[in-house]
């Protein structure tokens, strides 16, 4: 290829806009040429001519001449030294001195200023890369939940000027920095984030400008030495979920093996994408270049996170939201959840309720003359007629969930039919009603929630105003601290109203913690592992068995301990945790023996700990979870196939074999042991 001819102006532009080294080298070369040129011209003068008066500096005439010229070049005040010399000498020295003034006093200062300005500009625009950064947290993409993740990583609970933020005095050197890669305007992103953070944390946040689908940009994040990664993608970016998934594959290659497995938390914006990821096997995609596992792929969805914050065990610890069964369930009582708005948030709440709402007063088949008291869920949306076919195509087997009735209403919550339903259920003592307003527009959602029928909020009996038990949840997608505080402090009409869905509270460590699920999975993996058909887990389980054999040899009284018994013993937890973690990584999300949804039921199980129906409740939960994932009951054929999502155990609890019922019993026993290490989180 013929080399392009570059004009002089273009060369100058490249130098000016180049890096620090390029500008400095160009300056010194040009300055050196100017000095050399004047030195050569000085040879035209006679040897008896001096440029620095008669003062002898080095005892050598030639060196004194050169030194005198350099002194003039560096200091214009030395011009007086040429007094008495001829006009030609004075003019020559003046020109040389002037060149020094221009180059050293002008061009050098300009070059250094330009370098500093460029550096500042590059930092502000995210163009500066720090190659030695390590033990840092990485956030790829900028979106609504970014500030929430930063607050979580730093342990911040208040606003920018809050005094309840984590005290980092003396911890500056140990606090892990956060590196954010975004394709958005870095200046704007920095301003938005810093406006919501205490000032003392700003020094620990770094910004890179780049694209999520660029290998070089991801490589610049020092993935090989990172502590944890969050892949969020950019807000409203086309193909966001697909790009996030592709980015994870790049991270797996860059991480390499021989290091601690890196946790990569990946946000999937659409519930459909999130559900698909949970159904398919991705194990081979997320390995290092040598084929070994290098990362722990941890998908999450903002809307599901909020549903779990409302009602799940981990999310509900210590928060303000009441359970759906906010009273003790008696024989004829039932939970009734009304969801207004069938958008992503509404669907997430529906799916979470389907996993959670399994109670001891449901009797399969009306056994012993008792009723089949089912949970009721009503979903209201004015576009339901168009939205429902798509939803049922995505979740085709929800009709396998036998203890929950779902009703889809094409209309508005303002319709007389819906308003009358809310009043009737509020007045029905057996109905535990919760209304969740999930509209996307914060103002519309607020006005809709506060304009429900008055009888939903209070009643008048014996000439006295009494609050009803109905709970009302109002989605506020934006950060609405002011409105939230007003509602929280209201002890009158709106005392049972709470806001939810805020973007600054959608992610927390409790929600992302899979330890309990990991331990339960390890329990079943070890219990049912077939040593006659060894696979990739064989070495892990073999090491575990050897370790346990040594412990039992030292103390035979521990011979009956199972994995859960060992893991709750502080002196053995480290080894057991590592074993559970390795086994957890070998299986895809929906192939594990336990998951976060099972743990989310622990609060409900704890509330009804003395009920003989706990095992049935666990099986009903499992049926619901498998149905949501996409498993079809194959009880008639007896086929069990994970690839085709067929399972023969999606049947009533009483129809299960004794062996299968024992699995549900084990879940309850394991729950009791694991929860013995924690304060009981159940709420009445």
Give the role of each language-model region:
Residues 641-649:
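Short interaction-hotspot residues at assembly and binding interfaces
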Residues 1-35, 44, 48-62, 77-621, ...:
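Cytosolic regulatory regions of ion transport systems
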Residues 631-642:
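Short, motif-level signal for alpha-helix interfacial/capping segments enriched in acidic residues
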Residues 664-672:
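C-terminal non-catalytic accessory extensions
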């Amino acid at each position: 290829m013929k080399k392009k001819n570059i004009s002089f102006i273009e060369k100058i532009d490249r130098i000016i806009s180049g890096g620090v080294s390029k500008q400095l080298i160009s300056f010194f070369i040009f300055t050196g040429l100017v000095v050399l040129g004047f030195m050569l011209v000085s040879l035209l003068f006679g040897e008896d001519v001096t440029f620095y008066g008669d003062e002898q500096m080095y005892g050598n005439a030639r060196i004194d001449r050169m030194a005198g010229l350099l002194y003039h070049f560096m200091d214009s005040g030395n011009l007086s030294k040429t007094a008495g010399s001829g006009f030609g000498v004075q003019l020559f020295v003046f020109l040389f001195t002037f060149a020094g003034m221009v180059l050293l006093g002008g061009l050098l200062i300009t070059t250094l200023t330009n370098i500093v300005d460029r550096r500042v500009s590059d930092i502000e625009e995210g163009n500066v890369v720090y190659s030695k950064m390590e033990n840092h947290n990485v956030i790829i993409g900028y979106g609504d939940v970014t500030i929430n993740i930063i607050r979580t990583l730093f342990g911040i609970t208040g606003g920018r000027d809050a005094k309840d933020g984590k005290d980092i005095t003396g911890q500056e050197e140990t606090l892990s920095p956060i590196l954010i890669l975004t394709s958005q305007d870095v200046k704007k992103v920095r301003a938005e984030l810093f406006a919501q953070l205490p000032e003392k944390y700003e020094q620990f946040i770094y910004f890179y400008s780049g694209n999520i689908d660029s290998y070089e940009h991801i490589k610049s994040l020092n993935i090989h030495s990172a502590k944890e990664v969050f892949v969020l993608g950019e807000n409203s970016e086309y193909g966001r979920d697909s790009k996030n998934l592709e980015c994870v594959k790049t991270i797996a290659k860059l991480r390499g093996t021989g290091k601690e497995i890196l946790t990569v938390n990946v946000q999937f914006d659409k519930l459909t994408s999130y559900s698909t990821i949970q159904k398919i096997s991705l194990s081979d995609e997320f390995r290092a270049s040598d084929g070994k596992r290098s990362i722990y792929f941890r998908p999450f969805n903002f809307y599901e996170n909020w549903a779990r914050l409302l009602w799940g065990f981990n999310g509900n610890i210590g928060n303000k939201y009441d359970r759906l069964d906010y009273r003790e369930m008696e024989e004829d009582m039932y939970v009734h959840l009304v969801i207004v708005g069938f958008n992503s948030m509404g669907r997430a709440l529906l799916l979470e309720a389907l996993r959670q709402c399994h109670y001891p007063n449901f009797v399969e088949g009306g056994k012993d003359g008792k009723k089949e008291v089912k949970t009721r869920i009503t979903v209201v949306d004015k576009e339901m007629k168009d939205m429902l076919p798509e939803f049922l195509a995505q979740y085709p087997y929800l009709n396998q969930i036998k203890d929950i009735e779902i009703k889809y209403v094409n209309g508005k919550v303002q319709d007389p039919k819906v308003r009358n339903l809310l009043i009737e259920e509020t007045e029905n003592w057996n109905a535990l009603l919760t209304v969740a307003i999930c509209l996307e527009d914060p103002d519309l959602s607020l006005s809709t929630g506060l304009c429900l029928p008055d009888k939903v909020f209070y009643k008048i009996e014996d000439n006295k105003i009494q609050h009803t038990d109905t709970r009302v949840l109002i989605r506020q997608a934006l950060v609405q601290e002011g409105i939230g505080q007003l509602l929280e402090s209201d002890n009158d009409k709106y005392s049972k109203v709470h806001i939810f869905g805020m973007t600054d509270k959608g992610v927390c460590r409790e929600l992302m913690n899979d330890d309990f699920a990991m331990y339960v999975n390890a329990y079943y993996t070890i219990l049912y592992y077939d040593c006659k058909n060894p696979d990739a887990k064989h070495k892990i389980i073999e090491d575990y068995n050897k370790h346990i054999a040594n412990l039992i040899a030292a103390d035979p009284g521990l011979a009956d301990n199972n994995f859960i018994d060992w893991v709750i013993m502080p002196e053995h937890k480290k080894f057991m945790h590592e074993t559970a973690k390795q086994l957890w990584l070998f299986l895809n999300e929906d192939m594990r023996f336990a998951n976060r949804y099972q743990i989310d039921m622990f609060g409900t199980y704890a509330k009804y700990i003395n009920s003989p129906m706990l095992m049935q409740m666990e099986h009903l939960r499992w049926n619901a979870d498998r149905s949501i994932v996409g498993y079809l009951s194959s009880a008639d054929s007896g086929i069990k196939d994970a690839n085709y999502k067929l399972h023969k155990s999606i049947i009533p609890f009483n129809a299960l074999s004794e062996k299968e019922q024992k699995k549900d019993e084990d879940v309850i026993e394991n729950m009791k042991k694991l929860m013995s290490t924690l304060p009981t989180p159940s709420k009445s």
